Amino acid sequence: MMDNRGNSSLPDKLPIFPDSARLPLTRSFYLEPMVTFHVHPEAPVSSPYSEELPRLPFPSDSLILGNYSEPCPFSFPMPYPNYRGCEYSYGPAFTRKRNERERQRVKCVNEGYAQLRHHLPEEYLEKRLSKVETLRAAIKYINYLQSLLYPDKAETKNNPGKVSSMIATTSHHADPMFRIV
């Protein structure tokens, strides 16, 4: 029995309609993909009133799929892109704008890498670096600059010999700040 505090107007049981009260549904209703999806879920859902409610006269899924001949009869996007083999296509104006945004994004990323390359020492500018090589060189250079700023911390790390050899090697060059070994 239901609690009468919140929903006092709800009946205890759902009404049962006789067979004469059922109205036949149109064929287009049967073929509508979203209706079919909601009316015939993948897994059956049990209901506490399943014994008392009559079953609606819907055709089986195989009948629906067999009569569904148009490749893409609906003009709205489906929740799943490849639902029943139909892909929603955007208009040409939308595609052009999307492609232009992507070109702008790639251009900005490439400009960022170009600016990063100009902050690296000259020895890295001898050849054109890939994006991965640019990032690795920047990491090495940042670590080198940190070792110059904080030599005590650099010597206490895992490779104290490597840091001291970097500092010793740079002392032979005219401008030690831009040399990395």
Swiss-Prot record:
Residues 93-145 form the bHLH domain. Widely expressed in fetal and adult tissues. The keyword Cell membrane does not apply. GO terms for biological process: positive regulation of transcription by RNA polymerase II; regulation of transcription by RNA polymerase II; salivary gland development; sensory epithelium regeneration; tissue homeostasis. Keywords: DNA-binding, Nucleus, Repressor, Transcription, Transcription regulation. GO terms for cellular component: chromatin; RNA polymerase II transcription regulator complex. Residues 93-106 are annotated as: Basic motif. Its main location: nucleus. Transcriptional repressor. Inhibits myogenesis. Plays a role in progenitor cells which differentiate into ductal and acinar, but not myoepithelial, cell lineages in the salivary glands. Involved in the functions of the microvillar cells and Bowman's glands and probably, in a non-cell-autonomous manner, in the development or regeneration of a complete olfactory epithelium (OE). Efficient DNA binding requires dimerization with another bHLH protein. This is Achaete-scute homolog 3. It comes from Homo sapiens (Human). The gene is ASCL3.
